[in-house]
């Protein structure tokens, strides 16, 4: 018999610890441990796999773990030249980006949410042997303290608050299975109602999980196929990839996964600069940035609506109806219809604003010299779309005017679902009021959290301290603006970087050699470690977006 057989006490103990860890731990700690584990495993595998050729020097361990963290947190901060990695290492980085992508991690969240509802449904089934013949009601399975633990599983963007002391059974309590008749005569729901509610949630959550999985798979397969066909049809683009010793299939799958996950890594040293004269490839890559991040809620709703029309399944329509009323299955990517429309409008306005400023300031710049008007327009649009969260560039950011760089910094700072909502829905106002009436302990901890701007200011100060010697000796490369760009880019998990150039040195160093790495790739060990902390903080920023409420500035 196996030591973990389903009938052994050891299996029961393992199952109990498993449920305690996954269903009672705060999502922040679960996700932090997940990203740390994937980053460490990726580093060990990158170190074990051979480099592209024996002539390529093996990077330092710090640079390899920096690359692993950058891929897992989808930040694309480059510390090692991408063309020095072997095909197996590139495929490993592809896997790290896939595992760290927001859509993929949300699928994992749906899986564990479904498991939680299934466990709750089994736990609330009536036991006739224990209670049916005794005439006694079944013991309550939910206490105020356990209610608080379960509610901590709700995503930070969709907070559900229930007051366990209220005497009236609200709709939320019915949904969560908290209503029950007690000895004081409180009008409550039965165990059967709770079980039915859990069964309904299990069905809809599982359905939503399969829809998102299908969306994820279809986008990747379609993107991979389109890029492979383009490289085969357009000889110039295919020659660029082949000339760098990269397989067309590896390039296609790497680029699609990186772009959809909004990482921004490209298997060429120059990034997408090598393909700025191929607007067709840029137009094929560009939609994946929006499909996997800023417009994911929009296309997810469209996909669900299309599937409902084709299949006629009422459960799909129920998902959209619940979200229209402010409900849903705790999946914060499935926004209400009104919020989705405003999100699409906001994204379009921000892209147009960036496009207009870039064309006005950079149309005749050296970075776009030699391109046709159409190629310049596509390149400008590509930069505008990527500035939010992907970070793929078609020109050297250090050559761009300061006004455009500052605008990019603002865009990198904004969360993906930043929305201009002139009129707030009634259910959103009700949710905000109920959130204010939540537990005092949760409110206190939220208020004690520092705001993202405060944390970023501290990180910038720390990096200015760790790099103070380089700032004094090389003030152009190590300008404060370049440091701010690098930190905000790491926080936004974007990957924009001004790079480092030996030509910009005030005191030329004969031993200096230009490398195709980001600006942070030249930082000290302390600076790189600090930036890795920024990457983790940025990847988990959804848990601290409402921090800093204790400060009152008047």
Swiss-Prot record:
Region (Disordered): 127-147
Gene, per the UniProt record: HKT1;5
Tissue: In roots, expressed in cells next to the protoxylem and the metaxylem I. In basal nodes, expressed in the phloem of some diffuse vascular bundles.
Organism: Oryza sativa subsp. japonica
GO BP, sorted A to Z: regulation of sodium ion transmembrane transporter activity; sodium ion transmembrane transport
Primary location recorded for the protein, binned into one broad class: membrane
Role according to the record: Sodium transporter that under salt stress mediates sodium exclusion in the phloem to prevent sodium transfer to young leaf blades and reproductive tissues.
Designated name of the protein: Cation transporter HKT1;5
Residue spans, topological domain Cytoplasmic: 1-25, 111-207, 301-341, 424-443, 539-554
A Pfam family that the UniProt record links to this protein: TrkH
Record-annotated membrane-spanning stretches: 26-46, 90-110, 208-230, 280-300, 342-362, 403-423, 444-464, 518-538
